[in-house]
Each structure stands twice: as C-alpha cells, then as structure tokens.
Curated annotation (Swiss-Prot):
GO terms for molecular function: adenylate kinase activity; ATP binding. ATP binds at residues 10-18. InterPro entries: Adenylate_kinase_AdkA, P-loop_NTPase. It comes from Methanococcus maripaludis (strain DSM 14266 / JCM 13030 / NBRC 101832 / S2 / LL). The lineage of its organism: Archaea, Methanobacteriati, Methanobacteriota, Methanomada group, Methanococci. Belongs to the archaeal adenylate kinase family. It is found in: Cytoplasm. This is Adenylate kinase.
Length: 192
C-alpha cells in the first residue's frame, strides 16, 4: 500500500526546510513518522551509486539526458520509500537560472513520485530578502524583493501544474517572521 507523498517547496530563504523539520519532529512525537527526503540528495545518491558523481557539484556537469534519468530514478526510489511510510520531499518547485525558471519536478519525475499534496511555503518578499542578507552561512545571489515575489509566483504556477498532472492538492503555507509556530501548525494540519 502506498503511503502519503507530500512535496514541500519554497524559494531559498523562506524557511521551508525549518518549518518541515519542526513539523516532522512534533508529528513523530504523536506517532506519525514521515521519512523526510531532500530530492537533490536522492539524486546524488543515485549518481554516486552509478559512479557518475562523487559530490553534488559534479551532478550539474552531467549531460541533460543523464540528469533526466537520474531524476526519474530518484523519483522512483522515493515512491518506493512511500510503500513503507509517509514521505515528505523537500525540493524546489522551480529553480531560477540565467535562462529562466526550470521546473523542479518535471513530468518524468512527477510520474514516478505521484504526490498526494504539494505544499508551497511562502512569505513576503522583503522578509525573505532580509533573511537572506542576515544568513552569512549561505552564498546566495542578491535579488530584489520584486524578483523574489516573481519567483514565488512562478512556484505557485508550477505547483498548480503539478496538481493538474497528478491530482495532488496544493496548499500555500505562510511562514511570517516571528510566527514559525503558526506555519508549523498549518503544515501539520495538512500532514495528519
């Protein structure tokens, strides 16, 4: 039997991973144990097992067809995990590149993953900008509030297209400054 597959997305700096991890910890205490999987890590595991990459940076240098195959295999592995327990997949709905927005979950991944719910974690663009500026542990491209808002709009559009292709519901969770507990509670209500 397939358990729930939930995809959690958000722009860099929105706090999606933090909100998800806190929700997972509380749900685990309640006896609901999700397996949390980062999609990029799942891809790296496949590439590493095949001897194609020994670090994540090397994956970007693989030819597009190999990358697509690795994406598909990672989606299949995550779907297999869902036979054992519910799975929360931490990934990006879209990736902003110099040539435009790249879908984080192209059709060949969605077919394998078949998510039940797609969650988009958001907040105001100026809050994200301030979080990015204060986070010295990460090297992120400097963006304007307007470009962050555009990226969030594209994430919503991509999430809805993922829903159209799979029948998944799409939920927007707001992670406002100082109100992370509200975001965690909202996320948990969907995950239960």
């Amino acid at each position: 039997m397939k358990n729930k597959v939930v995809v959690v997305t958000g722009v860099p700096g929105v706090g999606g991973t933090t909100v998800t991890q806190k929700a997972m910890d509380i749900l685990s205490e309640e006896g609901l144990n999700y397996k949390m999987v980062n999609f990029g890590s799942a891809m790296f595991d496949v590439a590493n097992e095949e001897g194609l990459a020994s670090d994540r940076d090397q994956m970007r240098r693989l030819d597009p067809e190999t990358q697509k195959r690795i994406q598909k295999m990672a989606g299949r592995k995550i779907a297999e995990m869902a036979k054992e327990s519910p799975v929360a997949v931490d990934t990006h709905s879209t990736v902003k590149t110099p040539k435009g927005y790249l879908p984080g979950l192209p059709a060949w991944v969605l077919t394998e993953l078949n998510p039940d719910i797609v969650i988009v974690v958001e907040t105001d663009g100026d809050e994200i900008l301030m979080r990015r500026l204060s986070d010295e542990s990460r090297k992120r491209d400097l963006e304007t509030t307007a470009s962050i808002e555009e990226h969030q709009f594209m994430n919503r559009a991509a999430a809805m297209s993922y829903g159209v292709l799979t029948g998944a519901t799409v939920k927007i969770v707001k992670n406002k400054n100082g109100l992370v507990d509200n975001a965690v509670e909202e996320l948990m209500s969907v995950l239960r």
